[in-house]
Structure formats: structure tokens, C-alpha cells
Amino acid sequence: MAYAQDGSLLIDEKKIAPRQSTGEGEEEHPMNQIIVPMGKHIKLQLSDGSQLDINSGTKVVYPQKFKKEYREIFVEGEIFIDVTHKESNIPFIVKTSLFTVNVLGTAFNVKAYKEDTKAEVVLVRGKVEVKDKKEQNYTLMPNELIALNEGTYTDKKKVNALDYISWIDGILTLNNQALSIVLEQLHR
């Protein structure tokens, strides 16, 4: 499933016509919502060409077609996103209930499940800026992780980013994790 630049939906490379606007009171950029059931994960291409891998138990809200001024999506759960460089002059923003990530051309993982007080962002390549609930900004470089608790910065450290995105290939890498975390990951 993917979106073309004009906002039309592509399923198996076949174009599905976008919904026609009545012009009265409708949003200029209608929002879509995708909810991935437990035990599943899906891939999604946004209208700008950015690729999302969406993990189980995750909700993503995104526009059918991005605004000209900025690109913004909302996440509750875990995604890996590879932001396209075609429109690098247009900011790409990922919002969660706990923090905001301003993308500076990159690929990264966001983990912010609604039921968890702890959240994290791991950078694979490029550069991102994470803004916590206290409006503090933290810049990440490749193979760095920022941890937040209830939306507030708690830690920044060097990691092997590939360990944090192995879920995309159906592999859980849980080195030195507490049993409670292992069980939580297996549940999802």
C-alpha cells in the first residue's frame, strides 16, 4: 500500500481515485489512520515517498497528502521510518503524546506505546532533534538512543541501532533485558 504525490491510494501499484471533496467544511488535507493489530506489522509508503514499518499494537495518523509547509504524522506505538530526501527542504515532524521528533533527513525508530511510561528514539542514519515535554531539545547522531520517561529526558547513549529495528524482519533482539521487558515484547 502506498500513496502517490497527488494523495491517491496505490494498492498493488493500481491507483484508487481519491475521495472527491464537497468543498463545504472539509479539511484541505484529510487525515488517515492506520491501526496495526497485535502480532502483525505492516509497511506503508507516504505520499512524499517516505517508508514506514509499523509494529504491532501501533496507531499512525497521517495526511493523505502533506501540506506544502511541513510534513507531520502522529504515532502511538512503534515505527521505523525512512524519510525521503526528495523534499528535504520541507520539515518532517513525528509527534507522540510524550515527545516530538524533528527530522533532519534520516532513518530512525520511535517507540512510544500509550500504555508505557518509557519511550525511546533510536537513530539509524542522518540526524534528528527530539523535543521532550519540557520543551528541551536533544540532537541524535547515528547509533544513539534517547530514553524518555513520561515525556521527560532520562538518558542518551550509544547503541547498535540495528538491534532496535530487528523487529522489522520478525526478530526480537533483547540483550540483557529484564524478564518483564522480554514478556512485554513477546506479547506485542
Where are these regions (language model features)?
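A residue-level detector for the "anchor" residue at the start of short, highly conserved motifs
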Residues: 1-188
